[in-house]
């Protein structure tokens, strides 16, 4: 049976997992949504920190190919899939969700880094105040 109503956030669960080992995270949907909102706040903060690192990495790139860094992208996607696989018992298919999320995330960061790259200029050598590459 399908419902066209959003679930009540104050009531108790209306379904249970068949897995006897399942451990609930909260007793109401409202509590779960509060936890999710808090996690979203932390995630956005971490994304902002990642963005600062991506911006700084722009200084080390010579051209658009290096900005895109396809080998690094493949490395990141493989790494996050492996990390997510450790948690797949909690959420089946998590590696697929994480990889899809990271593919979107990385595409957005590369687009931003490409725009930032256009705002840089090559360092002329010798530069007395600059360390050698």
Residue ranges and their predicted role:
Residues 2-133:
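Domain-level signature for soluble enzymes in the chorismate/prephenate branch of the shikimate pathway
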């Amino acid at each position: 049976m399908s419902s066209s109503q959003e679930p009540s956030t104050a009531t108790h669960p209306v379904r249970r997992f068949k897995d006897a080992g399942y451990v609930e995270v909260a007793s109401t949907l409202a509590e779960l949504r509060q936890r999710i909102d808090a996690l979203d706040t932390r995630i956005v903060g971490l994304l902002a920190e990642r963005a600062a690192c991506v911006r700084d990495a722009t200084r080390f790139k010579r051209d658009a190919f290096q900005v895109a860094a396809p080998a690094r992208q493949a490395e990141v996607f493989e790494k996050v899939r492996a990390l997510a696989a450790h948690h797949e018992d909690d959420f089946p298919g998590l590696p697929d969700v994480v990889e899809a999320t990271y593919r979107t995330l990385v595409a957005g960061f590369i687009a931003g880094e490409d725009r930032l790259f256009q705002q840089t200029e090559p360092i002329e050598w010798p530069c007395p105040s600059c360390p050698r590459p």
